Amino acid sequence: QSIETLREAIALGKEREVDFLLAVGGGSVIDGAKLIAAGLLYDGDAWELVRKGASQRTVPLGTVLTIPATGSEMNNGAVISRRETKEKYPFYGNYPLFSILDPEKTFTLPQRQVACGLADTFVHVMEQYMTVAGQSRVMDRWAEGILQTLVEIAPEIRENQHDYDLMADFMLSATMGLNGFIAMGVAQDWATHMIGHELTALHGLTHGATLAIVLPG
């Protein structure tokens, strides 16, 4: 989500004295709402919050997920871009108070978005699972379970995106891939994501597509 758009949302929210946010969408929408939640209680420019990297003073936020991918519905992270300078940085706020995950909301997604979401989820897990081998057998087995689920369901989703159970597995995999669970006691390397962010900032490529390009094969 771009800071230019989010500044407008923050200004409108302050004018209307907004005290609760409901983000309905995918990772970009939820990420943007996290910065809005912080910006509503900040007197300066919201980009300053992004460059600081974090803010724990926010208005409450809930989410309704429509595109599984980023795990933003169950973590406190966000990624915010700035079109003017072609920059893209991580930002950390508060966790959503609740998130609603209804697989039926994914039935009409374009297949390209689904593919990008699957790639994003897969790389999230890989950047935790593959960094240092053998740190935690329990976390390794959990990570492998998510990876195996993605490998199994991806071709099935391509053939039948209206299967409730398939899309439920996809949604849960995306959430579990980046909610901190499989990261417990595990070193992480996010180089693939950092390079992917640069490709998005400089060339406007979809995040999941950049990860599919960059992840070592």
Predicted features and spans:
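N-terminal small/polar loop signature for handling phosphorylated ligands or for N-terminal nucleophile
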Residues: 1-44, 53, 156-167
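Residues on a specific face of well-ordered alpha-helices
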Residues: 30-38, 59-62, 74-78, 116, ...
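Short glycine/serine/threonine-rich phosphate/pyrophosphate-binding segments
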Residues: 3-6, 28-34, 71-74, 188, ...
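A glycine/threonine-rich phosphate-anchoring loop and its flanking beta-alpha core
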Residues: 41-137
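Acidic-glycine-rich active-site phosphate/pyrophosphate-binding loop
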Residues: 7-10, 92-99, 120, 186-193
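Active-site segments that bind and position negatively charged phosphate/pyrophosphate groups
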Residues: 128, 132-217
